[in-house]
A protein has these predicted regions:
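A short, conserved alpha-helix in the catalytic core of glycosyltransferases
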Residues: 164-224
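Short, acidic, metal-binding catalytic loop of nucleotide-sugar glycosyltransferases
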Residues: 20-29
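Conserved donor NDP-sugar-binding/catalytic core segment of glycosyltransferases
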Residues: 94-127
Length: 295
């Protein structure tokens, strides 16, 4: 048995498309939709299509708990040894989940695995495989040092998109929260997602904790899903606020003892300065009705 947990917040018709694709999987499956007090018709639409399917369960939360909180609300209803955390704007192929299960069975050292996440145009989505964004790597990205010193591993950025895809499953440092295939026993040891991250960076935090617990994280290049993006309507400033807040917490959680305190202070200040400089642009996007992807 595999349990899929989907956190929904005003995802519209995308939620139904995601669940429909999951229900096409051949193996035993349970789907838990954790709804963060949506105000649209996404749940009603889903129930109209699949309300009679016993594999589907709806958990109605009384407020918007964020991604981590929504995922954690679904955990008590998990059955089986594997849990798939997947965004509501993702569409999977019928064999994807079973292939991920088979892979995890053959790699007992792996606590979590991710797959190739594609954009609608078929290109690889940035963030589906990456190095941990340490303060140094983030500085490299901001200053574009990877372009000044191509090929120098000291100046590589954290995103791996654009590099050649491996021919087989490989270990990576971090994957995307849009699709996380997790071993339940590892989850019990590592613990739930950190709810201090409302949106973004909770996946990085979890990857760090899984690796600290001795588990590997696998990237599976021959299993692909499509991430449509736009699964939730939120203002650009709201999303970027939580993204920057999450990065500041992530740096403090894992790197405050590895870097001099003055450097960490500068890094945190740089995070908030970046958001401040972006704010006029983000406000303009909100006025134009442009909504970013929540993941």
């Amino acid at each position: 048995m595999i349990t899929a947990i989907i956190v929904n917040y005003n995802s519209g018709a995308l939620l139904t498309a995601c669940v429909t694709s999951l229900l096409a999987s051949p193996g035993p499956l349970k789907i838990v939709v954790s709804d963060n007090a949506s105000t649209d018709d996404s749940i009603e639409r889903l129930l109209a299509f699949h309300g009679d399917d016993e594999r589907l369960m709806i958990v109605r939360n009384g407020a918007n708990l964020g991604f981590s909180g929504g995922c954690n609300k679904g955990r008590p209803y998990v059955s089986g040894e594997y849990v798939l955390f997947i965004n509501p704007d993702c569409v999977v192929r019928p064999d994807a989940i079973e292939r991920m299960r088979t892979l995890m069975e053959s790699h007992p050292e792996a606590g979590m695995a991710g797959c190739l996440i594609r954009n609608v145009d078929g290109s690889e989505q940035v963030g589906c495989r990456r190095y941990v964004p340490t303060p140094w790597r983030s500085l490299v990205r901001v200053l574009r040092l990877d372009r000044l010193f191509p090929g120098d591993l000291r100046f590589r950025t954290f995103n791996m998109a654009g590099t050649p895809l491996p021919s087989r499953p490989v270990q990576i440092e971090a994957l995307s929260g849009a699709f996380m295939f997790v071993r339940r026993s590892a989850l019990a040891q590592v613990g739930p997602l950190d709810e201090h991250y409302f949106l973004h960076c909770e996946d990085l935090d979890w990857c760090m904790r899984f690796r600290q617990a001795g588990y590997t994280i696998l990237f599976v290049p021959d299993v692909a899903i499509t991430h449509l993006k736009g699964g939730s309507q939120a203002s650009p400033l709201f999303v970027e606020w939580h993204k920057h807040k999450g990065m500041a917490r992530f740096y403090q959680q894992f790197f405050r003892h590895e870097y001099p305190w003055i450097l960490m202070l500068l890094v945190i200040l740089a995070v908030w300065a970046r958001l401040f400089l972006m704010s006029p642009y983000l406000f303009l996007r909100r006025e134009q009705g442009i909504h970013p992807d929540m993941r």
